[in-house]
Protein backbone atom coordinates (compact mmCIF):
# COMPACT_ATOMS: atom_id res chain seq x y z
CA UNK A 1 0.00 0.00 0.00
CA UNK A 2 1.33 3.47 -0.94
CA UNK A 3 2.12 5.91 1.90
CA UNK A 4 -0.44 8.64 2.50
CA UNK A 5 0.40 12.16 1.41
CA UNK A 6 0.89 14.35 4.45
CA UNK A 7 -1.53 17.27 4.76
CA UNK A 8 0.10 20.58 5.59
CA UNK A 9 -1.77 22.86 8.00
CA UNK A 10 -2.44 26.43 6.97
CA UNK A 11 0.58 28.50 7.90
CA UNK A 12 -1.43 31.58 8.88
CA UNK A 13 -4.92 32.99 9.14
CA UNK A 14 -6.81 33.73 5.93
CA UNK A 15 -5.79 37.05 4.42
CA UNK A 16 -8.13 40.00 4.65
CA UNK A 17 -10.40 40.42 1.67
CA UNK A 18 -9.20 43.21 -0.58
CA UNK A 19 -11.44 43.50 -3.62
CA UNK A 20 -9.73 44.76 -6.75
CA UNK A 21 -10.14 48.42 -7.56
CA UNK A 22 -13.18 48.90 -9.78
CA UNK A 23 -13.35 51.17 -12.78
CA UNK A 24 -16.41 53.40 -12.94
CA UNK A 25 -17.49 55.86 -15.59
CA UNK A 26 -17.40 59.46 -14.38
CA UNK A 27 -19.47 62.35 -15.70
CA UNK A 28 -16.83 63.50 -18.23
CA UNK A 29 -16.48 60.02 -19.74
CA UNK A 30 -12.99 59.29 -18.39
CA UNK A 31 -12.48 56.08 -16.42
CA UNK A 32 -11.91 56.57 -12.69
CA UNK A 33 -10.68 53.99 -10.20
CA UNK A 34 -12.42 53.62 -6.87
CA UNK A 35 -10.28 53.18 -3.79
CA UNK A 36 -9.59 49.57 -2.77
CA UNK A 37 -11.39 48.75 0.49
CA UNK A 38 -9.30 47.82 3.49
CA UNK A 39 -10.98 45.86 6.27
CA UNK A 40 -10.00 46.84 9.79
CA UNK A 41 -11.27 46.35 13.35
CA UNK A 42 -11.44 50.12 13.94
CA UNK A 43 -15.19 50.35 14.47
CA UNK A 44 -15.15 47.45 16.95
CA UNK A 45 -12.15 48.84 18.84
CA UNK A 46 -13.94 52.20 19.04
CA UNK A 47 -17.13 50.58 20.40
CA UNK A 48 -15.16 48.76 23.13
CA UNK A 49 -13.33 51.99 24.01
CA UNK A 50 -16.66 53.81 24.42
CA UNK A 51 -18.03 51.00 26.62
CA UNK A 52 -15.03 51.14 28.95
CA UNK A 53 -14.10 54.86 28.79
CA UNK A 54 -17.00 56.89 27.31
CA UNK A 55 -15.20 60.26 27.53
CA UNK A 56 -11.90 59.09 25.97
CA UNK A 57 -10.91 59.38 22.30
CA UNK A 58 -8.26 57.60 20.24
CA UNK A 59 -5.81 58.97 17.67
CA UNK A 60 -5.48 57.52 14.18
CA UNK A 61 -1.98 56.24 14.97
CA UNK A 62 -3.17 54.55 18.19
CA UNK A 63 -6.07 52.99 16.26
CA UNK A 64 -3.60 51.68 13.67
CA UNK A 65 -1.48 50.15 16.45
CA UNK A 66 -4.55 48.53 18.03
CA UNK A 67 -5.61 47.16 14.65
CA UNK A 68 -2.14 45.65 14.12
CA UNK A 69 -2.28 44.17 17.62
CA UNK A 70 -5.65 42.48 16.97
CA UNK A 71 -4.42 41.12 13.61
CA UNK A 72 -1.24 39.80 15.26
CA UNK A 73 -3.10 38.05 18.10
CA UNK A 74 -5.63 36.51 15.70
CA UNK A 75 -2.83 35.28 13.46
CA UNK A 76 -0.96 33.71 16.40
CA UNK A 77 -4.12 31.97 17.64
CA UNK A 78 -5.01 30.70 14.15
CA UNK A 79 -1.48 29.43 13.59
CA UNK A 80 -1.36 27.62 16.94
CA UNK A 81 -4.86 26.17 16.42
CA UNK A 82 -3.78 24.93 12.98
CA UNK A 83 -0.76 23.17 14.50
CA UNK A 84 -2.96 21.59 17.19
CA UNK A 85 -5.39 20.29 14.55
CA UNK A 86 -2.48 18.85 12.56
CA UNK A 87 -1.01 17.13 15.65
CA UNK A 88 -4.37 15.45 16.26
CA UNK A 89 -4.75 14.54 12.56
CA UNK A 90 -7.87 16.69 12.18
CA UNK A 91 -8.61 18.75 9.08
CA UNK A 92 -10.95 21.16 10.87
CA UNK A 93 -10.15 23.77 13.50
CA UNK A 94 -12.87 23.56 16.16
CA UNK A 95 -13.67 25.68 19.21
CA UNK A 96 -11.55 23.29 21.26
CA UNK A 97 -8.41 24.01 19.21
CA UNK A 98 -9.04 27.75 19.46
CA UNK A 99 -9.51 27.50 23.23
CA UNK A 100 -6.31 25.45 23.67
CA UNK A 101 -4.39 27.87 21.43
CA UNK A 102 -5.57 30.81 23.56
CA UNK A 103 -4.43 29.00 26.72
CA UNK A 104 -1.00 28.38 25.16
CA UNK A 105 -0.49 31.89 23.77
CA UNK A 106 -1.92 34.20 26.44
CA UNK A 107 -0.36 34.31 29.91
CA UNK A 108 -2.11 33.23 33.15
CA UNK A 109 -5.09 35.31 34.19
CA UNK A 110 -5.47 36.86 30.72
CA UNK A 111 -5.96 33.38 29.22
CA UNK A 112 -8.60 32.51 31.85
CA UNK A 113 -10.58 35.69 31.10
CA UNK A 114 -10.24 35.20 27.33
CA UNK A 115 -11.48 31.60 27.55
CA UNK A 116 -14.46 32.53 29.73
CA UNK A 117 -15.43 35.45 27.44
CA UNK A 118 -15.01 33.25 24.36
CA UNK A 119 -17.17 30.51 25.89
CA UNK A 120 -19.81 33.11 26.76
CA UNK A 121 -19.75 34.50 23.19
CA UNK A 122 -20.09 31.02 21.62
CA UNK A 123 -22.99 30.18 23.97
CA UNK A 124 -24.73 33.47 23.11
CA UNK A 125 -24.22 32.84 19.38
CA UNK A 126 -25.50 29.24 19.63
CA UNK A 127 -28.63 30.23 21.54
CA UNK A 128 -29.38 33.07 19.09
CA UNK A 129 -29.13 30.82 16.01
CA UNK A 130 -31.61 28.23 17.40
Swiss-Prot record:
Phosphoserine found at: 11
Region spans: Disordered: 1-38
Keyword Translocase: no
Glycyl lysine isopeptide (Lys-Gly) (interchain with G-Cter in SUMO) crosslink location in chain: 7-8, 17-18
GO molecular function ontology, one term from the record: DNA binding
Keywords, ordered alphabetically: Acetylation, Chromosome, DNA-binding, Isopeptide bond, Nucleosome core, Nucleus, Phosphoprotein, Ubl conjugation
Highest taxon listed in the record's lineage: Eukaryota
PTM (free text): Monoubiquitinated by the UBC2-BRE1 complex to form H2BK123ub1. H2BK123ub1 gives a specific tag for epigenetic transcriptional activation and is also prerequisite for H3K4me and H3K79me formation. H2BK123ub1 also modulates the formation of double-strand breaks during meiosis and is a prerequisite for DNA-damage checkpoint activation.
GO cellular component assignments: nucleosome; nucleus
Pfam family name, one: Histone
Listed Basic and acidic residues bias regions: 1-19
Cross-link (Glycyl lysine isopeptide (Lys-Gly) (interchain with G-Cter in ubiquitin)): 124
N6-acetyllysine modifications at: 7-8, 12, 17
Subcellular location: Nucleus; Chromosome
Acyltransferase is among the record's keywords: no
Similarity comment text for this entry: Belongs to the histone H2B family.
Subunit structure, as described in the record: The nucleosome is a histone octamer containing two molecules each of H2A, H2B, H3 and H4 assembled in one H3-H4 heterotetramer and two H2A-H2B heterodimers. The octamer wraps approximately 147 bp of DNA.
Its job: Core component of nucleosome. Nucleosomes wrap and compact DNA into chromatin, limiting DNA accessibility to the cellular machineries which require DNA as a template. Histones thereby play a central role in transcription regulation, DNA repair, DNA replication and chromosomal stability. DNA accessibility is regulated via a complex set of post-translational modifications of histones, also called histone code, and nucleosome remodeling.
Full protein name: Histone H2B.2
Organism: Candida albicans (strain SC5314 / ATCC MYA-2876) (Yeast)
Lineage: Eukaryota, Fungi, Dikarya, Ascomycota, Saccharomycotina
Amino acid sequence: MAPKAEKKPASKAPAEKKPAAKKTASTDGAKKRTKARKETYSSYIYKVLKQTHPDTGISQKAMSIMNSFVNDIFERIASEASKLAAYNKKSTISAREIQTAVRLILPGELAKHAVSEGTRAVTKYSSASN
